[in-house]
Amino acid sequence: EGKWGGEVKDRPILFSGPMVRAIREGRKTQTRRLIKFEWSGSREALMHQATFDPAYKCPYGKPGDRLWVRETWGLMANHDVTDWFRDSIVGIPESELRELYLVEHAANWRIPSESAYWRPSIHMPRWASRITLEIVSLRVEKLQNISNEDCWNEGMCDATNPERKANRKWFSELWESINGLGSWDLNPWV
């Protein structure tokens, strides 16, 4: 049982490379996701659903549940092969061996024929995930109601903006890079 009550559940969630880096650097502590309504046919039901009654169930869980992050990943060798390789042939110190994740290397390093190694985030199994996040709160709002502080909590990094002035333009560009051109202007519920 979780500290918020009820059984704790783990669910997967996809993040892009830049957002995984922001999570690992401690810059991203919030995420906004489109609300996908399942409308029923009656007028009363539509009115009820439009008021965002607390009965709306978030598909990612409730406070206390965990989200395991799916990111682009690759299996270079299993531990048996790594141990044999290290001990028998090369003698590489343990401190120099580590797992590889594309998000850390995308900017300055490539494996030859990388398509043979890297797998899309959607196919990442639970055991390969290195980041688990806990849901601490949920809220529903219109996308463009994002506050200045929330822009930063979405992972904004701008060294030219040391006063942390809001940059809604940055967030709107991030949103459209994920959800398509014009998606910011639609101002959906998130």
Question: Where are the model-predicted features located?
Answer:
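Secondary-structure transition motif
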Residues: 1-190
